[in-house]
Amino acid sequence: MSATTPTVKPTTGPLSTALVAGVGLLLAMDVAGAIISLSAGLSPTLLDALGPQARLSAPIPMMIAQVLLVAGATRRRRGVAVPASALLAVTGVLAFMSGFYDGGYAADLTAGQRVFQIALVTAHLGVGVLAGFRLVRLLRR
């Protein structure tokens, strides 16, 4: 007889897949935004472009939090998935709101940079909405 430890696997439903893809897109956009910011002279270093004063990307701690939260939100265990989904939904709203408080929306950006910023914030809100749908689905089980 061998004892096996249960493993917690992520769910493979379309909503979970969309959440993982959405956070993957956010990470790619964050890195691209940091490179754009660096090449345009908005930030002196790559770490500054990914720091608290970033205009075209999320700060590194937010990116790490989103990866951890999507890992939790896509788990089958409700005890993990419910709070992770709720927090991931909140991060979408925080990403949007932070631009009003940190001067990100008032920054002097070119039209292309502004379009990228709008696309990034929209993607953050989209992931937040997906996380909200995941939360509702979990709470209805």
For each predicted feature, which ranges?
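Hydrophobic transmembrane helix segments
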Residues: G22-M63
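Loop-to-transmembrane helix junctions at the membrane interface
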Residues: V67-M97
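Alpha-helical membrane-associated segments of multi-pass integral membrane proteins
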Residues: L19, A107-R140
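Membrane-interfacial loop-to-transmembrane-helix junctions in polytopic alpha-helical membrane proteins
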Residues: V8-A18, L47-L50, A54, A73-P83, ...
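Alpha-helical transmembrane segments of polytopic membrane proteins
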Residues: L50-Q66, A95, G112-G126
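Juxtamembrane "helix-exit" motif on the non-cytosolic side of transmembrane helices
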Residues: I35-P44, M97-D108
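Alpha-helical transmembrane segments in multipass membrane proteins, preferentially the mid-helix core
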Residues: M62-A73, V129-R137
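Cytosolic juxtamembrane helix and N-cap/initiation of the first transmembrane helix
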Residues: M1-A32, R134-R141
